[in-house]
Amino acid sequence: LSNPPFGTPWKTDLKAWGIGKKDEISDSRFIINYDDNSEYSLIPDIGDPQMLFLANNISKMKTTTELGSRIIEVHNGSSLFTGKPGSGPSNLRRYIFEQDLCEAIIAISENMFYNTGIGTYLWVLTNKKDEKRKGKVQLIDATSMKEPLRKNLGDKNCEMTQKMREKVMELYLAFDKADSEYSKVFLNEEFGFYQVEVNQPLRLRVNVSDEALEEFKNSVKDDEFYDFLMTNEKDTESTNFNSFIGKLEKSAKKAGLKWTKKRENAIRKYFTTTDENADVVLDKKGNIEPDNNLKDTEQVPLLYDGGITGFFENEVKPYVEDAWINEDSAVIGYELSFTKYFYKPVQLRDLSDIIADIRAIEQSTDGLLASIIGGEV
């Protein structure tokens, strides 16, 4: 059982280890060999030690006994989702779910603690799951199970009664047969996703205008190349960057100029603009160059039918035909949201009740204007 501090920086702990930065940590509790990565980091942000406590406890779980080990830790909501894919917090969640360590996560009401009003979550972990729980996680929403205190204790204004605690235990023990209003069971992979990079082709229009030439002259200080452009390319326009560069390189060499990467980059910087109607730009190997300004990321659920390819065909290609996914960029992340699974929409009032209220207001204000101006309306 553990109740780690919320949002307390652990810089002083680094000093106790004799370490200056968290990137220098090599402790096997927090840097493990996993997923073909000998330096797989479970280290959270320096401002919140909750998941550091969790990783530490996981490293101490017994594997040689019949019952193994069981961990219950109280965390705030950030442990459910903080950290991008590949970061320490996301890696720890991934490790927990992929190693099938999480039995349940229980959401508790706000204002249960003396010094904080935020909602909290109980992480229930074990390395010896019952057969029926293997490969699955139970989420229990106990946020409505509270009774107000007669007198507040700091931020604490409510508590869970004995009957409420028994109700949570009943839900936990019932597992997949529990009341679905309060309990839901999912496959571990439900909370995992691929974060992938979606690219669109770079399209450049060339325009060797007077303004661009003047900016080039003042910024680059390459008089030889400037004179060449003024003489040979002034007012040139093209929607095919590769064709323009190819011809420019040949004519520059023919004129005795050295063609360099610096000069080619200068052409891009000062004489091109992106244009969706221009031709696609290709690199030296003939590959389509991506437009960094149009680069986007998508989260593809691990359980998405057809995987990354299926997601692209269904969710991206119909809207951006020339886009492509860089599958080498795929990083696995894990996060979850209780709101997503236990969302309860606000019950709207019946229209007849609203109309009745409006009519009542009209009646109560009848004659008000007349009394104000001293006459009848």
Summary of predicted features, one role per range:
Residues 370, 374-377:
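Residue-level recognition of alpha-helical coiled-coils
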